[in-house]
Amino acid sequence: MQITDVRIRKITSEGKMKAIVSVTFDNEFVVHDIKVIEGQNGLFIAMPSRKTPDGEFKDIAHPINTATREKIQSAILAEYEKVKNEEETKTETEE
C-alpha cells in the first residue's frame, strides 16, 4: 500500500489542532479529516473519529500496526511542514 497523495485542507495557528488532512492510498482510497495536533512531545496525527453517545471518541478508520501509523504520520507531517513553510514565505514576500 502506497501513499499517493497528501492534501493539507486547512491550516490554523490557533489552538492545538494545526491542520486537517486527506490522504490517498494507491490512487484508489482516501481518508479525510485526519488532524495534525500539537502535543507536549511535538506534532502527531489523530485519525478521523466520532463521538459515541457516552462521550467517548472512537476512530472511524485507523492503521492496525505501528509501522503503518508511522508511515502515514511521516508523510503527513512532511507535507504539513512543506505547506506551512510555503505559506510563511508567501506571507513574508507580500509584506
UniProtKB/Swiss-Prot annotation:
GO biological process: division septum assembly; sporulation resulting in formation of a cellular spore
UniProt key word Disulfide bond: no
InterPro entries linked: SpoVG, SpoVG_sf
Keyword Transmembrane: no
Entry keywords, A to Z: Cell cycle, Cell division, Septation
Gene3D superfamilies cross-referenced by the UniProt entry: Stage V sporulation protein G (3.30.1120.40)
Top-level taxon: Bacteria
Recorded family membership: Belongs to the SpoVG family.
NCBIfam families linked to this entry: PRK13259.1
Physiological role: Could be involved in septation.
Protein name: Putative septation protein SpoVG
Taxonomic lineage from the root: Bacteria, Bacillati, Bacillota, Clostridia, Eubacteriales
